[in-house]
Amino acid sequence: MAQHENLSVVLYEKNDLRLEYRPIPEPESNEVLLKMHSVGICGSDVHYWQNGRIGDNVVRKPMVLGHEGSGTVFKVGPGVHHLKPGDRVAIEPGIPREYDEHCRAGRYNLSPTIFFCATPPDNGHLCQYHTHNANYCYKLPESLSFEEGALIEPLSVAIHACRRGGITIGSKVLILGAGTIGIMNLLVSKAMGASQVLICDLLESRLKKAKQMGATFTIAVEKNMSSKELSQKIRDAFGGAMADTSIECTGAELCIQAGIYATKSGGVLVLVGMDKPSANIPVLEVGIREIDIRGVFRYCNTWPVAIDMLASKAIDVKPVVTHRFLLEEAVKAFETTKKGVGIKVMLKCDSSNENH
């Protein structure tokens, strides 16, 4: 195999996104070499491209983007025995580097030294060939497509968020933001027994998609609307009731505030979206009504559950993909994502395999 056949999407610095050939890596003992098939573009990929950083994570050297992927095992390291060439797998992008207190507690996503694809300085898998720890590659049932395998990553965010939110049978759930993560939270909320799910967004096209995918109510957020006005619309839609659990997926201050005002006393607000480092919130409202605010950082222990949910047809994530591009069209795909067109943009890394 020629050593220049690994086409990769590489971010050099802010606004400097390139397609380039890199050497095909060799798997270490506990790794597999994957021939990538489908990789979704995440908002964080675009944020790194546009800003060169997310918080303290700064792009200081060229980095391969992408952390929502699936592919086929091409080669296995000598220490790998549960996977073989030809196996179709979904990739969990976060791999603990050490067995610290967070790992011992089963919350390895909180480990400060975790390897995470496409978080500086760690390379992602928006490329044709990628090596990955075999224990974080999960076999896909024949009934699931590569695209569904790639969508397990954003689905995992929603599973973790809904777990953190304590959603159960009969819950009234508010979701702020109808992008990929908002839609995934809609699907998981309903699968976990929510009786009513209300979703808000600025874009009518996204709300239409949310309605098609099972939202009970949708609300179009107006640009000049106050957080109290939005929360009142939410209460009106719920027939005067308030949400048991609110899941904020935008990071926008207005939506965080509205989530607090629209959540019942003793309820839970889950913060999934990330935008600015800080936000003004009505702390008195939180305190006197005992609203629990819970953060979400990625996920942990979700891939097997997600695969079971998809294989059992408990949820259908396929309609989330609205745009597809070849790997060679990566820049166009990133521009499409940046414009907020559609929901999920998917890149196809293996043009010889048309199986979605």
PLM features per residue range, with description:
Residues 1-4, 8, 257-261, 300, ...:
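C-terminal hydrophobic helical "lid"/dimerization subdomain
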Residues 25-39, 54-101, 141-143:
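Glycine-rich beta-strand-centered segment in the early N-terminal region that forms part
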Residues 97-176:
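NAD(P)H dinucleotide-binding glycine-rich loop of Rossmann-like/cofactor-binding domains
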Residues 175-178, 190-256:
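Adenosine-nucleotide cofactor-binding segment
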Residues 182-183:
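N-terminal Rossmann-fold NAD(P) dinucleotide-binding loop
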Residues 267:
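Glycine-centered, small-residue-biased loops immediately flanking beta-strands
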Residues 273-289:
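Rossmann-fold NAD(P)-binding glycine/threonine-rich loop
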